[in-house]
């Protein structure tokens, strides 16, 4: 009896578990479906990227002689959801069971489990740590901290290890990083790819079917197959990795990419494997082509943060995205959808997101995320925004970054402190403030940077929770030393700003 082998849009790896299980007579099922394309209103470039990559991947499998039943979005027989397509294909091919690789989202894991056909969900072993390994690591720990997990992953992979010791004698070189960046005309941007006929057909489809989703569809310049993704990797290793470390926390308003790799779309869709990306970085270090602090910082993001976030998502369970530890209920303001704002940092971070479906980590954390947290925005709305607007967004990685790291809505599972800052941090790490209508040096008054007002207001509102936090508790000393009239003025002006935000007035 034929079996169906399910390959989802973010499982485009030749050695994904379900494909390794293929036997003669099996039918590989791939489907562009509205259920996946609309569970949030994804950025049009994200839909186009995945559909083009899916079509090309299917073509490669067919070229190997495998049988692929591929459904395009506009196929009149399309059942428009993964379960309905599996049932339709099972009837068509007389298949009685489905082999899948476990999806990266609880919603789909459950949908497959509920299918009225036997479904085997194989572990997704494209990740370094299995669920069991992460659970084992997490059990009996009072706090789950990425740094300890990361060291285990270094030992496990042998990456940047000299025997049982870390290369250079330290696990983490972040103290050499965190430098601001300067405008640099010679900095190499990631390679751009002109759409080929397959991609152009998909772009036309997306333009017709998703005209109202937030974000520009064209120009579209992402790679959509493994060969292109490998080109992006090679380019990053040759031109940007060496400077990655020092500038990884920097922001420049006219440079959306700096020395970031822009590899997350390819890693998350399966076109590149985390191991090969890290091996390439480690090899460049071993060859003396890049500094250790850059290679280490980059590898940590992948075998540390990326794996840790996935571990948390599966450890915490399906209700994680509903957490709201700080009881925040404000609606996401229209500026997140491109409504004009005088706040230059937000205006640029959102415009860049609209144009590229991309922002780098520190923009996501310290601009859009920081503002949402300071303003007390409902974390579920924030979560949906991030899931919608970024090309690399899948719940397993997006939710722990947003609900956990950025919004502290999980009460401290991911991070030991909330990532909040006044305008001072943004000014130090970027060139946004120079071009802003607000004054970053002003703590109160008409022109005061809203981050300055909201920072203290946030800390004052959440004093009970954070005053005893070992990482930020000390800041309350500064607040307490402030003149009470000044404290009142800050809080009044913060309240007035938030009232304008709620009223939909320009801010
Ligand atoms: P680089 O800076 O070049 O880093 C290299 C790689 O490290 C990335 O490609 C990524 O795979 C990995 N990485 C770095 N930081 C993280 C992290 N915190 N968690 C997981 N992986 C990491 N990343 C996603 O892949 N999808 C998301 O939906 C996503 N949402 C985020 C939301 C918020 C609020 C924050 C603060 C971070 C989010 N991240 C997400 C993490 C990070 O911002 C992106 O991985 C990174 O910006 C992708 O760009 P890059 O490939 O140029 O990364
Ligand atoms: C994100 C996405 C989109 C937009 N469309 C599809 C699709 O049509 N077919 C498909 O198989 N997968 C798609 N995906 C990726 C899935 O949403 C993803 O597999 C789950 O969210 C689990 O990570
Ligand atoms: Fe952003 Fe404040 Fe700087 Fe303006 S002054 S760019 S609002 S941090």
Predicted feature residues:
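Short His-Asn-centered micro-motif
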Residues: 6-10, 31-32, 71-73, 100-103, ...
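C-terminal catalytic domain of photolyase/cryptochrome flavoproteins
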Residues: 8, 220, 231, 248-250, ...
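A charged, amphipathic alpha-helical module
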Residues: 165-293
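A short acidic (Asp/Glu
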Residues: 15-18, 40-42, 80-83, 108-113, ...
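N-terminal beta-strand-loop-alpha-helix module at the start
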Residues: 1-73
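Beta-rich, aromatic/charged-enriched effector core domains that present basic-aromatic interfaces
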Residues: 81-222, 403
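Sequence termini and other peripheral, non-core segments
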Residues: 40, 80, 87-90, 122-124, ...
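N-terminal Rossmann-like or analogous alpha/beta NTP/dinucleotide-binding catalytic cores
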Residues: 42-89, 97, 102-104, 110, ...
